[in-house]
Amino acid sequence: MAAEASSTGLASCHLVESKSGAQGASGCQCTRCGRKVSVASGDHHKFPCGHAFCELCLLAPQEYTTSKCTDCEVHTTVSMNQGHYPVDGFIEEDSSLEALPPKMVNNCSSDLEKTVDQLINDLEHSSSIHRNVSNPSAVMSETEEIDEALKIAGCNFEQLSNAIKMLDSTQDQTRQETHSLTEAVEKQFDTLLASLDSRKKSLCEELIRRTDDYLSKLVTVKSYIEEKKSDLDAAMKIAKELRSAPSLRTYCDLTQIIRTLKLTFESELSQVSSIIPRNTPRLDINCSEAICMFSSMGKIEFEDSTKCYPQENEDGQNVQKKFNNRKELCCDVYSSLEKKKVDAAVLTDETPEPPLQAEAPDRHLEGKKKQPTKEMVVVTSPKTIAVLPQLGSSPDVIIEEIIEENLESCFTDDPIETSGYPKKPPQKEQSAPVGSKAGCPELVFVSHVIHPCHFYVRKYSQIKDATILEKKMKQVCNRSLHLDPSDILELGARIFVNSIKNRMWCRGIITEIIPSKTKNIRKPCSPTKFSVCEISLIQIFMVDFGNSEVLIITGVGDTHEGPEHDGEQHITLSDFCLLLMKSEPYSEELLKDIPHLAHLCSLKDIVPYNSTEGWEKEAKVEFLKMVNKKAVLMKVFGEEDDVLIVDLQKPPTNKISSDMPVSLRDALVFMELARFRSQSPRSHSEKNTTLCYHPPILPEEMTEVSVMVCHINSPTDFYLQLMENLDFLSLLKTIEEFYKGEDGENLEILCPLQNQACVAKFEDGIWYRAKVIGLPGHREVEVKYVDFGNTAKITLKDMRKIKDEFLEPPEKAIKCKLAYVEPSKKSQWSKKAKEKFEEKTQDKFVTCSVIKILENNVLLVELFDSRAPGKSAVSINDQLVKEGLASYEAGYTLKDNSKKHLEVWDPSPEEIITSEINNLSPLSVKSLPNENFQSLYNKELPVNICNVISPEKIYVQWLLTENLLNSLEEKMVAAYEHSEWKPVKWECDMHCAVKVPAKNQWRRGQILRMVTDKLVEVLLYDVGVELVVNIHCLRELQENLKTMGRLSLECSLVDIRPTGGSDKWTATACDCLSLHLTGAIATIILQESNTTWPLPVKIFCRDEKGERVDVSKYLIKKGLALRERRVSKSSNSHSPEKSLEIPLEQGDSVVTKCFKINFDTNKKIADKVNEHKVPDSKGKKSESRSTGCYRPPAVPNTSSFEAIVTCIGDDGTIFVVPKLSEFELIKMMDEIQSNLKCLGLLEPYSWKKGEPCAVRGSDTLWYRGKVMEVVGGTIRVQYLDHGFTEKIPQCHLYPILLYPDTPQFCIPCQLYQTLPVGNTWQPDAIELLQELLSKREVDIHIMELPNNSWGKLSVHLYFDGMSLSHFMAHHKYCIFEHTEEIFKEKPRGQNKKYEDENWKIRFEDLLLPEMEAPVLPPYLSSLLPPPEELFAVQVKHIVSPDEMYICLDSEDSYTQFNHHGDTDDSGVSWESESENLEEALQRFNKNVETFPPLTDFSSEMPCLAEYADGLWYRAKIISIKEFNPLSVLVLFVDYGCTEKLTINRLRQIPVQLMQYPAQAIKVLLAGFKPPLSDSGKTRIPYCPKWSMEALWTMIDCLQGKQLYASSVAQAPEQIVTLYEDEQYPVHMSLVEMGLADKDE
């Protein structure tokens, strides 16, 4: 605009110049000297400002050569050569509109006109009158006045231009807003009309429902009255007969008849009188009020458009109306005219700035007048989006248009301000599918409901997509042409429909077409394509709403919808073309980015309340009542077959008065409209299946145990825990880690039961084991924490189902009561008594003396304070009595302590420990390892385990050192809390005070090593912790703090060693030991009288069952350690420390220790340490090292032996087990199974290649194995005794060595002097070997022993006398290295058994009479009804999705189409019997053992075969599968299934059973075929063209449904089409899921 102002000023100057030039063409007057100069002479110079000077005035003064006008001081570039002075640049400062006074805006037009008229008059007057200007100053003042006027004119001109532009913009925007508002009004009132129509239908349905209920009651009462009337009529007839014939009275009870006649029917008549009065139904509606409300409904508000008015419409949804591009024109925008001085500097060689955009003046003006107008936009995150429906309470209807424009910015809960001018348009964001993350809640709208397990929702976040879709659909349908009667419609095709229910154009899919010629029933296998003019009914599914609409043409026969269309919207119209449009390619391209908005859902784990009757109508009504027209929170649990498994919940910030329950699923169950899948209706069997804990393990009576009191209600009602449990803390930690993760979300308990075991969250937010002890209601549950004894009331959200592994450990909390005492007031325990008892026992270790075990496992105990000062424990029971807080029970005799015992007892371990601690020497010398512990040798010493690093480094503290440790800590804090760091030269083994940064504690320590100049590694020897700290955390240890000895001892477990052949303990063993022992109370026993550092000890604790266990044996049992025989110290007397250390390197040889463990229960466990010297080979790694401690296979000491082939390796290696070793292998496997039943839960373990292990196979049996390769989360292992190699998960391995003294049973073999083609056995050759040799008995001839005991044995192998090498060479799989002859058959003379076997077969037995089998005809085949006839069938057996066995469901149909005469084609005559096949089979099953065995195994031979259920059924022989042992494949002709049976399960069939035709009919299904592209990886092995997913889906489609079939062809194969409920082809489910293609 500044440029426009400048141009305006220049134009005004040019105008003046031209006018003056026209009037004064003869000459001009010099402004400086007044001399007149002729214009034609050219001796004058005129400046752009209008002033003229003669050439003399410009040249004379030196300062005027700078091109400066002397009057107005405007600089101008002067060219003396050309004789004139052009303007290269002329810049005026931009005059802003705010510089003008307010009145000038209104009067600018008139002032401008006056100024222009006055200027023209002055110029005309000057042209006619030539006056001499004698005063140059006057001329200059006039010139200045003109310049100032031009400036003002330029500003006014700019203001007028801006005003016009603003008015044009406002005019356009107002029209757009009006148009948009008009559309919104129409849309809202259409919604109101639809709501009124829906309410009308609802009222009509309610009236009909109530009338039907009333009429049904009338019918019931009427039938009851009629029955009474008929009874009375019969009695009256009898009485009349007796009256006319007195002789008959003796044959009946006359008294009873008279009593019956006199009976009154008051109760029956009262029912009539009570049910007949009925209030006449009437319609209660206030139309006048509704009309009045409609007349004032809605209003158009003209408010500040930059504000947001959150309101609430009738549906309870928050809407906002935002006008983004609106601008206002204010009359008082400009307040004053700011006068600015024009910059007179001359710009050289610069172009003027381009004009600003149209929006720039508006922003500039708004900034000058006031702060920019801003609109408040409340932006919410998905978590708080449910707040929106609660804002506002105005009853007015607000015209709305919901358009979310910037979804990416809507992720903050704080309101933000945005300026009024437009922003950059947002980019489109692809919406994520519903339920992409299981458990992630999302707001949705329910769009259509069929029943609670079949409904559709639309995402709240897809409102923008819905709005865009509606606009695009309107655009597409406005441009597209309607259907033509000749257009072809096809089932499954996309189509656009003008939905009556949804009141808009919608996308749809054609799901049903009924042509007008078929009388409303489309026949099976009929065409799926029809022209529009041939269709009488069409059903369309709305993919964006979930509902279906049925369109019916009027006047075409008696067209009416079938029962399958009852729940759909029906529209009757004269022409489909009015509501339908075909989907064209350009429209598909336009809509392809918008996914289907309706998502199919089902409520999780609920079924109809009455499964036999299905979902009641009331369930759908209540469902709609709770979710209709409101946003609800949907929680997704998973997805099954494209159906989201969900629960609809109330948004957390929704109104309390809302109809939406907290959980829709629970609400339907509560209203008895549904039940959970695991429930049985009205069944009380839940109590029998309630999960319960094992009762706590109680100590024996009259024993003393160490316990901790965990919860106290009173001194006669408290709970305690037995101490020294290894796994209890681990159990608590495992429970917390599992349930605090996401896995616990799917274990919610919806209907808790009394005494049900569960896991519950406590006040500290941690999960503990609990059980339900009360159900107070209001979705609250009272639970008891079974490991602590306390109770609490919690909500269902703080409960979870308990896993089996957490259910097995018994309860830890034992209920107790103090013995001998009772409340002092004999009523209740006083508050002071409870507090004192808690003070003495709560969360403390005490000694418990069990007096008696009462009922319900309550212990009667006496507690002793084991921490009391002195040498003897004090009874807490007696203390309560002494302090007056309790009294002894009546009859209790006080203990007599007056007698002093004269016996002298050995000092207790506690006294010895106290004495040792007091006698410890100062720490100035490293004295503790050299202390004399002879007095403690082989005694049980209670300790607290403070830190575990490995089994050979465990730090313990004496129990009595706790007070010393606390006292020492107080001294350390007092000495070093406020101390300052001083530089000290630290060295190894120096003592120091260490500040532990993590705990802010001061501890004594000793420097182990200098890590860097700033970091040192120290040992906190009072607690046994090693850590690296900065030297700024160290202080010099004061001398008075060195007098007290170390408070922790370093110990090492004896008699165990690491697994895996290594000298280092695995991380798994260390972590497991640390997890179970750290912080536990245990007992140690010193194993050596002489001091060895660390102290060799045995550690004992109590496990979950309360049994005392040796920690060393515990590690061995877990497979984390191996037993080691203790070495006598006499042989290593020269080494007082590390006495068990054995050098591993001696000279040039490496010593390998091989530890052997035998689990043989019949032998005493022998622990040996063997040392084998193996030459140090740098070039080749020894293979014996990779096998761990197992021995190589033992090759029989013969040239040939019989064996069984167990496995064929991938490289062609043949693994065999000698027949002589087979029994030993079976025996060892049995022992392994019995010994490995009690393996515990395996902790994380780091596997290494070659490590021995125990493998749990797929048959759940344990095998010896070794690790071949570690690949990610799986491990490739080899079964040592069978040769198999496979990849299995780590959870199926256990690090344990099984029977190391037993050699490997299977021997790897290779064919002697046989080369496979290509030097490696090809895959087809491997397959042939596997098929030929697996589990086969063979003869092995040893030709060459391997160089290494683990190598392959070179052999000749013979199977059934045939040489395997010759066999493989004959089939071109291998060649021979040499031309030496290889026997084609096994030499006869080498094995007598081979010759004997050839003479075992005797033909005489086959001629015996009992071996004769009757000649029987084949089974009669069942026939199907003729084509195009629908008949009921049952599916007996499924071979593949398109091949199965069926039988006729109706017995009449079966008899009609399968009636055979008494004599068949073979001449065999059947006796007609009345019994059917089932009855005949039941009769023959009773004496089946009398039937002769089957001797004729020819194909198609009829027989009786034993099924898996132990019953015998009709069958026929298919083929012989195996000869050793003989097994036959048979087909059960009445069921269609096949099975491989041994001959002892086959019998000759009685002739009487041959008269019945085979029930199972083999058919092929028509209408579909395998898909061309199937992503399913798992195929059916015997039918690879079909996937397993397709097979399972077909089974689901057929199971439990009434099926019908229609025959398509009966020769050469029987082909049928299978239907569900006579209409829907079953294969359509596979086609819709993409598991099959249609076969036209």
Swiss-Prot record:
Q: In which tissues is it expressed?
A: Expressed at high levels in adult testis. Expressed in male germ cells (at protein level). Expressed at lower levels in adult thyroid, submaxillary gland, ovary and epididymis.
Q: List the record's Gene Ontology CC terms alphabetically.
A: cytoplasm; nucleus
Record's compositionally biased regions (Basic and acidic residues): 360-373, 1170-1184
Q: What is its main location?
A: cytoplasm
Cross-referenced Pfam families: TUDOR
* Keyword Zinc-finger part of the UniProt annotation: yes
ZnF start-end (RING-type): 30-73
Q: What happens when the gene is disrupted?
A: Male mice are sterile, exhibit a complete arrest in round spermatids and fail to produce sperm.
User: What GO terms in the biological process aspect are recorded for it?
Assistant: spermatid development
Presence of keyword Nucleus: yes
Tudor domain mapped to chain residues: 751-809, 985-1044, 1246-1303, 1496-1556
| Disordered as annotated region, ranges | 348-376, 413-435, 1170-1191
PROSITE patterns the record matches: TUDOR, ZF_RING_1, ZF_RING_2
Q: Where in the cell is it found?
A: Cytoplasm; Nucleus
Keyword annotations of the record: Acetylation, Cytoplasm, Developmental protein, Differentiation, Metal-binding, Nucleus, Phosphoprotein, Repeat, Spermatogenesis, Zinc, Zinc-finger
What CDD domains does the record point to?
Tudor_TDRD4_rpt1, Tudor_TDRD4_rpt2, Tudor_TDRD4_rpt3, Tudor_TDRD4_rpt4, Tudor_TDRD4_rpt5
The record's GO molecular-function terms, alphabetically, read: identical protein binding; zinc ion binding
**Which parts of the sequence carry N6-acetyllysine?**
K229
What does the subunit section of this Swiss-Prot or TrEMBL entry state?
Answer: Interacts with MXD1, MXD3, MXD4, MXI1 and PIWIL1. Self-associates.
Primary role: Seems to be involved in regulation of transcriptional activity of MYC. In vitro, inhibits DNA-binding activity of Mad-MAX heterodimers. Can recruit Mad transcriptional repressors (MXD1, MXD3, MXD4 and MXI1) to the cytoplasm. May be involved in spermiogenesis.
What is the designated name of this protein?
Answer: RING finger protein 17
Lineage here is: Eukaryota, Metazoa, Chordata, Craniata, Vertebrata
